[in-house]
Amino acid sequence: MSLKRILIMLLIGAVALCFSGCDLVTANTEELLSPPELTGELRLIKEALESSVNTPITLKYPSSGEYRSPVILRDVDSDGTDEAFAFYSTSDTELTSMNLSVVKYNKKENRWFALDRQTLTGSGVEKVVFSDLDSDGTEEIVVGWEIYAASEKQLAIYSVGETATTQRMLERYTTFLSTDLDEDKRPEILMQFLDTDAATNTASLIVLDENGVLKYGQCSMDGNVKTVLTPVLSPLSNGRPAVYFDEIKGVGAITEVIFFSKGELQNPLFDKEKLENKITLRDSALHINDINEDGILEIPIAKELINADITSTEKLNYTSWCAFNGENFTEMKLSVINTLDGYRIDIPEKWYGKIAISKNTEKRERVVYNYITDKEPSGEADETGEIGDMVVTLKTVTHSEFNSGRGFDKKKAVEICRGEQLVYLAIIPENTEGSVKVTIEELKQMIVPMQF
């Protein structure tokens, strides 16, 4: 390397150090990841808070939901002036307390001042929601407190007065969200709590009245699940508002749909006799999805598919994407999904019950065959038929494998589509017999990359 090039490299390095904005000797990960200091009005609010508490505080950021700031400005009483809601922790010996303080602005004195604070032992804030639950014109603040990280949480509801904040409820929960399931133009909180020790799972619809908390709707859910994913507020296919819960059950997943009807909270997919939901049980990688982009969520439901590999005992399935109206399912799309390679095959109606598939995970191949049977498809695999001619071989390769031509027959394989890392290929045999046939152009419409 020439002396000139060495000098240029040293100069570039020196300039980079000057403009790096941190001390390479003293910087550490905690400092680099620490949140920015509050400025302007928020700084004044924090100073008012610190003067009222008289102990060091650490601002706490909600980990999910719409509000992610430790200090939230919102006009909850519609008087034209924002109130500030501050979340912070304080430490006393070995205990850490989580705190909520409402900080108001005094126009006459041109300063912020803190009301009394609400305190409980905990570790963080999961989510914050504002909702007028007692219809008095002032929004309540609904806080999901993390007691022991995500393993135990408590839901608190607070009402804000002129001079004090009142706690209206404090209960254990797993998930919650603001809804209007009964469509009375009055918001409610739908709270769900999974008690894995007791194997119970319950959804409750909560409002406030003059006597306090009113749970005017409650229903059981599957208590055999281990994990509840984030619930989604979305309409049924008939337009009625509902909340969809995807849950992990054993090695699979289920969906429960909660809505309000006939004066009660309903969960019709829950079998009250067997105390579980089995009708939606499928691969754990499959979740609710608006698969046809019509604004209605579809639930993935498993239907048996013939395994063409007679040496394999593995059960294969179609995935039926179904809209739900609260009583019945309507199939919107039928797919065969490869979760390992990240794609689905949207199956034409005329193929249903007339194909069998073999899978080779090591070679990243799926082979579709004709399946010869006189029986009409019923959702259960008809094993009385026969495996017929091959329809198509689907193969997945990486971009580098595709570019180098490794691992597949370049003369026969045709690219159907590609994702960020993978290329999906098809090989259609010549002179195939059978009722099911396909072209490359049809496959390009049928195969869709998916993320799992």
For every predicted segment, state its role.
Residues 21-357, 400-419, 423, 445-452:
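Beta-propeller-forming repeat regions
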Residues 160, 396, 428:
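Active-site donor-binding loop signature of nucleotide-sugar glycosyltransferases
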Residues 248, 370-378, 427-433:
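Secondary-structure transition/turn motif
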Residues 2-27:
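Sec-dependent N-terminal signal peptides of Gram-positive bacterial secreted proteins and lipoproteins
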Residues 426-452:
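Surface-exposed amphipathic alpha-helical segments
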Residues 348-415:
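Secretory pathway targeting signatures of secreted, lumenal, and periplasmic proteins
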Residues 7, 98, 373-374:
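Charge-rich, low-complexity amphipathic helices
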